[in-house]
Amino acid sequence: MDHLYVDEAHSYKNAFLYTKMRNVAGIAQNEAQKSADMFNKCQYLDEITGGKGITFATDTPISNSMTELYVMQRYLQNSKLQNMGLGLFDSWASTFGEVVTSIELAPEGTGYRAKSRFARFYNIPELMNMFKEIADIKTSDQLKLPVPEAEYETVVLKPTEQQK
């Protein structure tokens, strides 16, 4: 086998991140076994094909956090990340972003709490140029897919006795 085609590649986004960052929203500290298995296969194919043995297909490479972009790059551009000194997540994160702590309303709604998240981004053109080496990005305007007209209907109901 010298090439791996992976459809629905977003299913493998839960790869472990070696990081010193703790309690930062969007940075998972758990790993799915299937993601570890996929990473090992990608590493092997990169070695025997010179980085040309893997094709990922997905319409949602990034859905919840920037860590998902790093994970996709790690699968498909690991050698490049290593050569650039960005192989570890903390190096990648400090090059392309910053953790920002802000005060937010607590989920219970009874007070406030400090919440840290990977929220400020830097070097976006460089990051996008790297990502475009492995991604064929198409916008809805480029695809020109038919979009059905929406039919909106408002239905007003009286509350039940329990809801009052």
Where are the regions a protein language model picked out?
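Walker B catalytic acidic pair
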Residues: 7-8
